[in-house]
């Protein structure tokens, strides 16, 4: 068990104590963890006084808000982890309740953005991870995440977090003589999400962002005397996001990208 308290003292927002406690129990290959923590965050100078021209081209402005209140949160976590042989896996869950969460959203003019305190905000999530490390140099890893976020303003959920996501990785590395070859396939899928935003007329409009899949492939070879070659393909399946101008998690729109590098380590090259 580990417990502690963090104290904050601010000339404007006063004194605040934030306790935290963590527990861990091990039984054979199983490890159980749990914890509770209280958070306290005062608005930053950027969140209070920003007047930033996004991109420097007059597209839109990001404004601070001098009326922001400190953000207070309470979070509870639980997790279970198993490690046996080539396998490692875990399941974890968390719940966070925010009071006066500081967020960035559309300003009252309907064009620019401004920081604000959400009326009510919660964040609930579950993470599942599994990994296999084989003796032949192959490693497989996969993870699933579920998150349910509510950041309400006037009864509308302004959060744009995608509720479901999957990530996977396959790595292979093998030495042939004095040459080491490697390959890595990485991918991520994110579900669609519906969110609300405030338009220029002061009304609330619901918008949906479609699901997306993004993958990459990387190949590498390491030779004696410090020589190394790498080649990669980004956006392997040529995914192009229709919502890139509005979505917070931007995916490149240039299509498939090819990367190649050849490098040499001078220190290794000059070794006798």
Regions found by a protein language model. Give the residues of each.
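Transmembrane beta-barrel strands of outer-membrane/channel proteins
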Residues: 3-7, 21, 34-38, 47, ...
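Gram-negative outer-membrane beta-barrel transporters
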Residues: 94-97, 116-197, 237-240, 261
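Outer-membrane beta-barrel signature, preferentially recognizing the C-terminal barrel domain
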Residues: 31, 38-98, 107-133, 159-164, ...
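C-terminal beta-signal and adjacent terminal beta-strands/loops
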Residues: 99, 140, 189-198, 219-272
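Repeated loop/turn-to-beta-strand initiation elements of outer-membrane beta-barrel proteins
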Residues: 1, 29-32, 86-89, 136-140, ...
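Residues on the lipid-exposed face of transmembrane beta-strands in outer-membrane beta-barrel proteins
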Residues: 21-25, 78-82, 128-132, 142, ...
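Surface-exposed extracellular loop regions of Gram-negative outer-membrane beta-barrel proteins
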Residues: 1-20, 130, 136-143
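Outer-membrane beta-barrel translocator domains and adjoining extracellular loop/strand segments
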Residues: 13-19, 46-51, 58-59, 101-109, ...
């Amino acid at each position: 068990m580990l417990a502690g308290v963090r104290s904050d003292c601010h000339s404007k927002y006063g004194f605040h104590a934030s306790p935290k406690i963590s527990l861990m129990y091990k039984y054979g290959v199983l490890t159980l963890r749990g914890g509770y923590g209280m958070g306290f965050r005062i608005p930053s100078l950027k969140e209070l006084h920003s007047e930033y021209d996004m991109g420097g081209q007059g597209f839109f402005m990001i404004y601070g808000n001098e009326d922001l209140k400190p953000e207070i949160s309470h979070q509870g976590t639980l997790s279970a982890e198993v490690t046996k042989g080539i396998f490692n896996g875990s399941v974890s869950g968390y719940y966070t309740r925010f009071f006066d969460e500081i967020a960035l959203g559309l300003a009252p003019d309907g064009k620019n953005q401004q920081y604000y305190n959400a009326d009510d905000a919660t964040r609930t999530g579950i993470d599942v991870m599994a990994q296999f490390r084989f003796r032949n140099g192959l490693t497989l890893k996969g993870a699933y995440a579920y998150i349910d976020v509510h950041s309400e303003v006037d009864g509308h959920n302004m959060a744009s977090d995608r509720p479901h996501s999957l990530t996977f990785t396959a790595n292979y590395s093998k030495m042939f003589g004095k040459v080491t070859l490697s390959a890595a396939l990485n991918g991520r899928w994110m579900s669609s999400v519906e969110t609300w935003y405030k338009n220029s007329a002061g009304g609330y409009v619901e918008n949906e962002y479609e699901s997306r899949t993004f993958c990459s492939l990387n190949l590498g070879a390491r030779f004696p005397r410090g020589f190394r070659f790498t080649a990669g393909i980004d956006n392997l399946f040529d995914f192009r996001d229709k919502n890139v101008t509005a979505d917070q998690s931007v995916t490149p729109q240039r299509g498939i990208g090819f990367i190649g590098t050849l490098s040499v380590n001078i220190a290794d090259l000059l070794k006798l």
